[in-house]
């Protein structure tokens, strides 16, 4: 589960490398975010010459979590890291490539562009 102050790896080529979560979107008292949820974050480290700069406030969708997600069939999916993809206001990714696998739950969340760019959907 991702909460305020959680650090996330960036799984796209937007130029950001690491994010710090500021807020979980979806209600004033919402504390945690899982796979497919949107967070507001700040860029803590960025690649030189990238589209985003250090200190910039961005929106991101969670694509991998260590705590994982429970599936309707009773199985769980867990990853080795917490990762997110930077998005625009219309839910399209800011980068043009996605690195690493993403969870199938993004398909139900309406992030078809991210799912189609990902090398593997688990």
Curated annotation (Swiss-Prot):
GO biological process, one term: translation
Gene3D superfamilies: Ribosomal protein L14 (2.40.150.20)
Highest taxon in the source lineage: Bacteria
SUPFAM superfamilies: Ribosomal protein L14
Gene Ontology MF terms in the entry: large ribosomal subunit rRNA binding; structural constituent of ribosome
Record CDD domains: Ribosomal_uL14
One Pfam family, short name: Ribosomal_L14
GO cellular component: cytosolic large ribosomal subunit
Claim: NAD is one of the keywords in the record: no
InterPro entries for the chain: Ribosomal_uL14 (IPR000218), Ribosomal_uL14_bac-type (IPR005745), Ribosomal_uL14_CS (IPR019972), Ribosomal_uL14_sf (IPR036853)
Family: Belongs to the universal ribosomal protein uL14 family.
Protein name, UniProt field: Large ribosomal subunit protein uL14
